[in-house]
UniProtKB/Swiss-Prot annotation:
Biased composition (Low complexity): 507-524
Gene: crtI
Pathway note: Carotenoid biosynthesis
GO biological process: carotene biosynthetic process; carotenoid biosynthetic process
Regulation: Is inhibited by diphenylamine (DPA). Is also slightly inhibited by NAD, NADP or ATP in the presence of FAD.
Molecular function in Gene Ontology: FAD binding; oxidoreductase activity, acting on the CH-CH group of donors
Listed name of the protein: Phytoene desaturase (neurosporene-forming)
């Protein structure tokens, strides 16, 4: 029996991140016998968690902005998302704490948003409204149109270029915010979102202001149990479909036939898993440079990948505190602590590769919403700081700098947000870009794969249907539509659009030779 025949009706998914799990669910619904392989000990990838001393640390994404995308996924698999996962709407969404003492609170309620803008800068109310109108236009084109179909052919790009021009995709996110409003606080509030998908707000295309419309239209939600609860529920659907989750298992290579067709994978222990369809949720850079290292490639060569711009790195400090549940009452679920510099600090991270003395921080306090995040009376936090990735000549040696940088982060949050927190910390874990490189096999330790600049977006990203190998498909942050929970879930939908239903197994009656009827025999 050939490997191709062995793999008929089987699909292998490399990586149990949200994109891989979404693809696996959809392939299971298409009739494939699916095996998901991941080197970690639990599903979720960057959206997984670790627990220490009763504190659950959500390692990556913390919010859900488009719950309808998840509900659609579940429904397409004959399931009800809301029976499997409990989502809690956030109100307010988050608070931005500026160094001059000003605060901006983002709400789902339009009247509250207008009042907040008017309080900070009355003259910018109309400009803010116009910005949100522009965000809606980009959402309708960029998310509902471009983001929901593959961009695998050059014509897919050419036919949308006029719309890109009309929407001023050449302008940066910050450039668009600057044009609409005059107040620097509001300019930050309208332009910082690309940092949550790995982009430099001063260079990322203004198409990404659509994130503001995502928040407005769908709200900001939190899953009880963290994003890990979503990943666990996805894995449960896959096994209920008859699929298999193989954790603590690393893939060594994607197997390719002489005629250029993916035929399965080889594990590190030498085991081969034949498959008709191979989906990689590993980072696109790792997929091509490592998993296809023995395959000649024409577009995604090592040299071309090395020339790409990768997203920034992340320094993330996870810590638990004792007896603090009633402390810091003005600190909610999500807070952004802004440093004294904006553009210059972003340039340090993305252009110069320098670890600056100042910083902007995202502070996540899930225990104010989710009692499962920490022991009763305690708190769980994660504090995230964007930092350079590992691709600079003057790169940061995190084995030396991690503790020093953590001390700087502690100083900022004690002074600005959580006074006295140092003496309350009982558990902690630190992730640096080196952790992202080693744990997630992320090129240069990038937090969000390829940076979403205009010439690294849509058709310019590694395609969902591999250009190098037939029968190989890519999902996750490094392919189309990009990073962020809605996009990686959407990448699973895109590959499912391109993959036909599994072949139906032959029934015994259909497979057996037809018996001659007496009449047919007599006629001979």
């Amino acid at each position: 029996m050939s490997k191709n025949t062995e793999g008929m009706g089987r699909a292998v998914v490399i990586g149990a991140g949200l994109g891989g799990l979404a693809a696996a669910m959809r392939l299971g619904a298409k009739g494939y016998k699916v095996t998901v392989v991941d080197r970690l000990d639990r599903p979720g990838g960057r959206g997984s968690s670790i627990t220490k001393g009763g504190h659950r640390f959500d390692l990556g994404p913390t919010i859900v902005t488009v719950p309808d995308r998840l509900r659609e996924l579940w429904a397409d698999c004959g399931r009800d998302f809301d029976k499997d996962v409990s989502l809690v709407p956030m109100e307010p969404f988050y608070t931005i704490d500026f160094p001059d003492g000003e605060k901006y609170t983002a709400y789902g309620d339009d009247a509250k948003v207008k009042a907040e803008v008017a309080r900070i800068s009355p003259g910018d109310v109309e400009g803010f409204r116009h910005f949100m109108w522009d965000a809606k236009a980009r959402y309708e084109f960029g998310y509902e149109n471009l983001g929901r179909k593959p961009m695998s052919k050059l014509w897919d790009l050419i036919k949308v270029l006029p719309t890109f021009g009309w929407l001023r995709a050449d302008r940066s996110v910050y450039g668009h915010a600057k044009k609409m409003v005059k107040d620097d606080h509001l300019r930050f509030a309208l332009s910082f979102h690309p940092l949550f998908i790995g982009g430099d707000p001063f260079h990322v295309t203004s198409m990404y202001i659509l994130v503001s419309q995502l928040e407005k239209k769908f709200g900001v939600h939190y899953a009880i149990g963290g994003v890990q609860a979503i990943a666990d529920a996805m894995a449960k659907v896959i096994t209920d479909q008859g699929g298999e989750m193989r954790l603590n298992t690393e893939v060594d290579e994607i197997l390719v036939s002489r005629d250029g067709k993916a035929t399965g994978i080889r594990l590190m222990d030498g085991t081969e898993l034949p498959a008709q369809v191979v989906v990689s949720n590993a980072d696109a850079g790792h997929t091509y440079k490592r998993l296809l290292r023995n395959r000649d490639r024409w577009r995604w060569t090592d040299e071309k990948l090395d020339k790409k711009r990768w997203s920034m790195g992340l320094f993330v400090w996870y810590f638990g505190t004792k007896g603090t549940a009633k402390m810091w009452k003005d600190v909610g679920h999500h807070t952004v602590v802004v440093g004294p510099r904006y553009k210059e600090h972003v340039q340090d991270i993305f252009i110069k590769g320098e670890l600056a003395e100042d910083m902007s921080l995202y502070v996540h306090r899930p225990s104010v919403t989710d009692p499962t995040a920490a022991p009763k009376g305690d708190d769980t936090f994660y504090v995230l700081s964007p930092v350079p990735n590992l691709g600079f000549d003057n790169g940061v040696d995190w084995s030396v700098e991690a503790e020093k940088y953590k001390a700087k982060v502690l100083k900022v949050i004690e002074e600005r947000l959580l006074p006295g927190v140092a003496e309350k910390i009982t558990e902690e874990v630190v992730f640096t870009p080196e952790t992202f490189r080693d744990r997630y096999l992320s090129p240069l330790g990038a937090g969000f794969s390829l940076e979403p600049r205009i010439l690294q977006s849509a058709w310019f990203r590694p395609h969902n249907a591999s250009e190098e190998v037939d029968g190989l498909y890519l999902v996750g942050a490094g392919t189309h539509p990009g990073a962020g929970v809605p996009s990686v879930i959407g990448s699973g939908e895109l590959v499912a659009q391109m993959i036909p239903d599994a072949p139906k197994p032959e029934t015994p009656a259909a497979a057996a030779p037809k018996a001659r009827t007496p009449r047919a025999k007599a006629a001979q």
